[in-house]
Amino acid sequence: MTAGTAMAKDKSDSTPAPARQAGEPAAASARPDIEAFIARARTLASSVEAGRRGRLIFALDATMSRQPTWDIACQLQAEMFREAAAIGGLEIQLVYYRGFKECRATDWIADGARLASLMTGITCQGGQTQIGKILAHARRETEKAKAQALVFVGDAMEEGIDDLAAAAGELGLRGVPAFVFQEGDDPVAERAFREIARLSHGAYCRFDVGAAHQLRELLRAAAAYAAGGMRALSDLSARQGRGAMALLQQMK
């Protein structure tokens, strides 16, 4: 099955299932990584046209091990819409892969309740990573209508790093930065994720396993950038307390 064929079938998953309740465990802070991500993202120029909503592709690994994080992301996605609302709004397209060569994308969504409803109807299934399909899909989408950013959340990489690097470079040429958020510390995944971020002119950040509060900060930052660029992200940083203030002081 090709990436194009898999994406073309998308729109929604037809097998609804309730999301599990995900807690917010007290994990060790990954604050330096989060601050580094925000610092990098603040250097990127905004590409949102006046009067238009920002467009963000929200991509998730939905293989079997990812169910707890999927449930967390389902709860946190509303944070992105809330963060972007005061800036000019946001449209999000959910993209996910799971099972045997299954990779799907939803329509563009401007409502958190609708996105949550779609996400709670999707269950994770065993399978290998399909990050290359996500990168290729992001390129095709921005060729149809400009996307401001790609966010990818995952913990593993089982593909050829050279192929992923080439696809990430294509996104960079089209002005679509990839914000790659790694759960855990797999070194193979980290190497690939850092390359994807670098070649797309995006940013990489690691967060602790199950740390909802860390992922929340990252998703809000990505949404701020997609909706309003550097200025919006700088404004968000100014509201985030001591960690963000320390970041601003370092950047002076």
Segments and roles (model prediction):
Residues 174, 192, 199-200:
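Short, structured coil segments at secondary-structure junctions
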Residues 200, 204-252:
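C-terminal "exit" segments of structured domains
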